[in-house]
């Protein structure tokens, strides 16, 4: 069984995930998704009781993989059929747990959102970013932002502290969901999708007639963009990406480009004026820097 467990963990690592320290056969385990903080539980795995196979995945990226132990004797048709059946059962089990956690998170999000008051315009984060509240609320001193799907269902919340620290409500559905920043979702003529909420506020204030959606992070740009294209096939769609020029490979801009290609959208990246600091990365940074320069 040790070899099976070791090989199963190797398969999980090969998919870009770090498996939990202890895996008990027959039990569904949860662990952080790819690149997520230690408290995250988007990753999951289940090793079958006999150690001959298992499956795993990452709900934050949408991947699902299977693993089957190698042996000298080929698996029979009946064994292959049994393996396929057990994989489907494991996937359904993981899906049921995810749905239950997301339903619970949605209830908690609704309760917090309904009890929260409108955010004051003098919140330190708003002042530092030079943006308006745009419907944000306040909960325990943090800006509270709704995360919704395309049916307007509240799925989670994002909290932004005075110092800019960000946190998503645990267990909530994020993939394919977004923070509605501004604009009319009934019949939009132009949709702009960006990563962060502050960037979205800057874009909304610059283009007040556009529907602006914040995808929360670069990895969620493509799922949101594809859904926008599905909802409004002929809409003018713009992916306003971040430009992390100092990071090798510029992953944020790369993901923005991939989202634009997948959704047949325009790609917009900040155009940096001569002399602007290389530490600037997004449209909010650009807008703030221009204001500072213009005011001396």
Give a label for each model feature.
Residues 14-17, 131, 265:
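Short aromatic/hydrophobic-glycine micro-motifs
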Residues 20, 38, 96-143, 148-163, ...:
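Nucleic-acid enzyme cleavage-core boundary/entry regions
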Residues 1-124, 244, 251:
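Non-catalytic accessory segments of DNA primases and related replication-initiation nucleases
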Residues 9, 123-126, 200, 257:
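Short glycine-/small-residue-rich flexible loop motifs, especially phosphate/cofactor-binding loops
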Residues 104, 142-233:
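Phosphate-handling DNA/RNA-contact segment within nucleic-acid enzymes
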Residues 1-6, 189, 205-296:
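TOPRIM fold recognition
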Residues 28-39, 144-146, 277-285:
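Short, solvent-exposed polar/charged micro-motifs at secondary-structure junctions
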């Amino acid at each position: 069984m040790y070899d099976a467990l070791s090989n199963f963990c190797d398969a999980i690592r090969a998919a870009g995930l770090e498996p939990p320290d202890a895996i008990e056969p027959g039990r569904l385990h949860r662990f952080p998704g790819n690149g997520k903080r230690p408290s995250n539980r988007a990753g999951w795995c289940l090793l079958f009781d006999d150690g001959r196979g298992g499956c795993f995945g990452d709900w934050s990226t949408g991947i699902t993989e299977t693993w089957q132990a190698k042996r000298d004797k080929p698996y029979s048709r009946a064994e292959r059929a049994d393996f396929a059946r057990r994989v489907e059962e494991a996937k359904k089990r993981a899906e049921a747990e995810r749905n239950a956690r997301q339903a619970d998170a949605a209830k908690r999000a609704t309760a917090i959102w309904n009890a929260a008051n409108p955010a004051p315009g003098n919140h330190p984060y708003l002042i530092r970013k030079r943006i308006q509240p745009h419907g944000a609320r306040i909960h325990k001193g943090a800006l509270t932002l709704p995360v919704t799907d395309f049916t307007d269902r509240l799925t989670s919340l994002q909290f932004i502290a005075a110092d800019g620290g960000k946190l998503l409500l645990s267990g909530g559905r994020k993939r394919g969901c977004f923070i509605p920043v501004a604009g009319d979702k009934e019949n939009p003529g132009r949709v702009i999708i960006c990563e962060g909420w502050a960037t979205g506020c800057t874009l909304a204030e610059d283009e007040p007639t556009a529907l602006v959606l914040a995808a929360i992070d670069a990895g969620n740009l493509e799922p949101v963009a594809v859904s926008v294209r599905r909802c409004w096939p002929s809409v003018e769609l713009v992916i306003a990406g971040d430009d992390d020029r100092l990071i090798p490979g510029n992953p944020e801009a790369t993901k923005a480009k991939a989202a634009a290609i997948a959704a047949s959208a325009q790609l917009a990246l900040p155009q940096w004026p001569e002399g602007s600091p290389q530490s600037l990365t997004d449209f909010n940074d650009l807008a703030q820097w221009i204001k500072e320069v213009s005011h001396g």
